A protein has these predicted regions:
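Intrinsically disordered, low-complexity proline/glycine-rich segments
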Residues: 1-90
Length: 90
């Protein structure tokens, strides 16, 4: 198995300047809720607004949702660019 991209969490950011605004209240990484497919991203680009995170990890799940990692995207096209510095495990 190879190294996976770091896990995205509540408050992590995107290349659109947005922020992940919902995440698990049960599963955490570094003490911060893990973002899953369907959690929400708030994008500051006019017309984008709040959209769900639509791509997810390679089968890894939290709360029944695919885990979001750096490189995954929101419905508005934003790419997640920050995540846990210690979660790049396989």
């Amino acid at each position: 198995m190879g190294t996976l991209s770091p896990i995205a969490r509540l408050g992590d950011t995107s290349d659109h300047g947005g922020t992940i605004i919902t995440a698990s209240t049960v599963v955490s990484c570094d003490g911060i809720g893990v973002a899953g497919q369907g959690d929400l991203h708030s994008c500051p680009i006019p017309g984008h607004g709040v959209t769900p995170l639509i791509s997810g990890s390679d089968g890894k799940m939290a709360d029944g949702l695919l885990i979001i990692r750096i490189g995954d995207i929101a419905e508005c096209g934003a790419v997640v660019i920050t995540g846990s510095p210690v979660s790049s495990s396989t």
